[in-house]
Curated annotation (Swiss-Prot):
Pathway: Purine metabolism; IMP biosynthesis via de novo pathway; 5-formamido-1-(5-phospho-D-ribosyl)imidazole-4-carboxamide from 5-amino-1-(5-phospho-D-ribosyl)imidazole-4-carboxamide (10-formyl THF route): step 1/1; Purine metabolism; IMP biosynthesis via de novo pathway; IMP from 5-formamido-1-(5-phospho-D-ribosyl)imidazole-4-carboxamide: step 1/1. GO terms for molecular function: IMP cyclohydrolase activity; phosphoribosylaminoimidazolecarboxamide formyltransferase activity. This is Bifunctional purine biosynthesis protein PurH. It comes from Lactobacillus delbrueckii subsp. bulgaricus (strain ATCC 11842 / DSM 20081 / BCRC 10696 / JCM 1002 / NBRC 13953 / NCIMB 11778 / NCTC 12712 / WDCM 00102 / Lb 14). One of its GO terms (cellular component) is cytosol. NCBIfam families: PRK00881.1, purH. The gene is purH. Keywords: Hydrolase, Multifunctional enzyme, Purine biosynthesis, Transferase. It catalyses: (6R)-10-formyltetrahydrofolate + 5-amino-1-(5-phospho-beta-D-ribosyl)imidazole-4-carboxamide = 5-formamido-1-(5-phospho-D-ribosyl)imidazole-4-carboxamide + (6S)-5,6,7,8-tetrahydrofolate; IMP + H2O = 5-formamido-1-(5-phospho-D-ribosyl)imidazole-4-carboxamide. Its EC number is 2.1.2.3, 3.5.4.10.
């Protein structure tokens, strides 16, 4: 007769699985609550205490940490000396372990969890058994996921045991589980200790889906979600219509959400290839849409749209007229949703709770060859009070509002970034050029006939030379916002004074790559 050790916190589907083991001549060793469930189901079990000859102690903290358990798991059956040691100490080999771990993740996700509660839900004995069984997978089957119950039983019923290939696969899966489990504990305790740059960094994510392809069709791709999901994330959005999200869809939608959360008035952000092609705000969402659309009616085709208010019918009918990849909003009126779905089976319509948009943000990571860059997200809260006017001309209140709008927009534009705007919408966006003057030329060219005495300009970084200010002055720009900090700042200030431009320094740069 073979022996299985069963000790789980999640008891779903457990009884049928264990009954299958018993039917195939396994005796069952179990602990605590698991044993009670199996006993109540009429399944004969042996308590761990009967195996070890030692009771549970320290409120259950020590149950299975015993040579009679780990010797039975780690002994190599092909080595005569190991077999002799088992016989000498009367240790019975264990052939299968079914374990899942204390719900540490679920515990720390509770809003009012205490450190003491979290600590008590750090499993010690479970991971120890998982690791012992996994290390000795040549002889022991480790089962940590109820999704594997059926396959394990099927192989046992057919061949008397699982295959070596299956045991190796299950062992790798089990080590992934313990690694992820430890990573969450490490992350939680590191945050509690106030450490921001630990000497070791282990991140853990859960596979959400395999994607059709990556950034390009020849690239394979998978979507993983943070093991502690963030509420304000495209990955938490409810999809109401359309095809599955692509790799590029998710990146654009993420950037659109980052951008739209900057604004408090009804706002529409149109994102294309990680750059805003149009941002509009107004007293109503429809008005905001009109302004975002007119900002660049060409580039918005095939774009990703983020809105920060519930979508009404009037706005929906206007969006429905053009091809869009994604619409994401806090909610939709019933008739608005129906209108968007009409003859648009592929349009991805997403609903996301915007009430959590200001929750604490996690670190950003970017992979580089051989490493990982980690930084805080660029979520600095800025306002007029943080700015310094450095020119003879001073911005009017309307210009200040326009400058703040443009500053929020340029923050989400790829560097080198220039945005021309008023306090209602972007007029022109220049993104991603190796030199700043070229980005400015693109932005002003896009603004074209919309340039008037209300137009202002924002730059994500300082002007290295005065040419950008001169170009702006020649095209009628009357107010500029930029970080300042160049060794040639005075040249730019002098040029602004020459053209009567009000220029403010923020002291903060917003590179985005």
């Amino acid at each position: 007769m073979k022996r299985a050790l069963v000790s789980v916190s999640d008891k779903n589907n457990l009884v049928p699985f264990v009954k299958g083991l018993v039917a195939n001549d396994y005796e069952i060793v179990s602990t605590g609550g698991t044993k009670r469930v199996l006993d109540e189901a009429g399944i004969p079990t042996i308590s761990v205490e009967d195996v070890t000859g030692f009771p549970e102690i320290l409120d259950g903290r020590v149950k299975t940490l015993n040579p009679y358990i780990h010797g039975g798991l780690l002994a190599r059956r092909e080595l005569p000396e190991h077999v002799a040691t088992l016989k000498e100490h009367k240790i019975t080999p264990i052939d299968l372990v079914c374990v899942n771990l204390y719900p540490f993740k679920q515990t720390i996700e509770k809003p009012d969890v205490t450190l003491a509660e979290a600590i008590e839900n750090i499993d010690i004995g479970g991971p120890s058994m998982v690791r012992s069984a996994s290390k000795n997978y040549r002889d022991v089957t480790i089962v940590v996921d109820q999704a594997d119950y059926d396959q394990v039983l099927a192989e046992i019923e057919k061949d008397g045991s699982t295959s070596l290939e299956t045991r190796a696969r299950l062992a790798a899966k089990a080590f992934r589980l313990t690694a992820s489990y430890d990573a969450l504990i490490s992350q939680y305790l590191t945050e509690k200790a106030g450490e921001t740059a630990p000497e070791k960094l282990t991140l853990t994510y859960d596979l959400k889906e395999a994607m059709r392809y990556g950034e390009n069709s020849h690239q394979k791709a998978w979507l993983y979600e943070d093991a502690l999901p963030k509420a304000f994330s495209v990955l938490q959005a409810e999809q109401l219509n359309g095809k599955e999200l692509s790799y590029n869809n998710i990146k654009d939608a993420d950037e659109a959400l980052r951008c739209v959360r900057e604004f408090s008035k009804p706002t529409v952000v149109a994102m294309k290839h990680m750059n805003p092609c149009g941002i509009g705000q107004g007293n109503t969402l429809e008005e905001a849409w009109d302004r975002a659309y007119v900002a660049d009616p060409v580039s918005i085709f095939g774009g990703v749209i983020a809105l920060n208010r519930k979508v009404d019918l009037a706005t929906a009918e206007k969006m429905h007229k053009i091809f869009l990849e994604i619409i994401i909003a806090p909610d939709y009126d019933e008739d608005a949703l129906a209108a968007l779905k009409t003859k648009k089976k592929n349009l991805r319509i997403l609903k996301l709770d915007f009430s959590k948009k200001d929750e604490a943000t996690s670190k950003e990571t970017v992979s580089v060859m051989g490493g990982l860059l980690v930084q805080d997200q660029d979520v600095l809260d800025e306002d007029f009070a943080d700015w310094e006017c450095v020119t003879e001309a001073k911005p009017t209140q309307e210009q200040l509002e326009s400058l703040l709008f443009a500053w929020k927009a340029v923050k989400h534009t790829k560097s080198n970034a220039i945005v021309v705007a008023n306090n209602e919408r972007t007029l022109g966006v220049g993104a991603g050029q190796p030199n700043r003057i070229d980005s400015e030329k693109i932005a002003i060219d896009h603004a074209a006939e919309a340039l008037d005495d209300r137009a202002v300009l924002a730059s994500d970084a300082f002007f290295p030379f005065s040419d950008c200010v001169e170009y702006a002055g020649k095209h009628g720009i009357k107010a500029i916002v930029q970080p300042g900090g160049s060794v040639r700042d005075q040249e730019s200030i002098d040029m602004a004074n020459k053209y009567g431009i009000a220029m403010v320094f923020t002291g903060v740069r917003h590179f985005r790559h």
